[in-house]
Amino acid sequence: MALGATTYKTPNIINQIDEDLTAKEGCGVFLYAANRVRLATDATAIPYGIIVTGTDSVTPGTYPSAIGDASLEMVDQLGCVVQVLISSAGSVAANDTLLIDSTDADGTFTNTTNQAPAVGEWAWGLALTDAGAGEQCLMRFQPVGRQA
């Protein structure tokens, strides 16, 4: 899912996860505690990165837990282009501002037309392509928090 030379993969300082991240490619995560990430389930979660390759823990079903055999890969460098998964809320268009869909609460993204951002919520970046609900689009990872 990562694209070309503009992408960057974290040299896995993240060594614990708070849930099964298998098949969560294109979803947003936030830093929950030191060296530990969790799916961003609402727009107030401070952006950490986008999952490129998901994984489970070494003890599936028990969380927090150490990352499993497969590596967890994320794009977390500002300005990188990454594919993200659009929520069930509706389609997005190129140039839409994307944020975590607080209704689906599963790390997927929606635009500000489908969910108006409130103070303290985060825009994660701009859509670079069009996509329908449940599809993927390209997004430039450029988080910005909404101020008063």
Indicate residue ranges for each PLM-predicted region.
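Surface-exposed, low-hydrophobicity beta-strand/loop segments enriched in small/polar/acidic residues
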Residues: 1-148
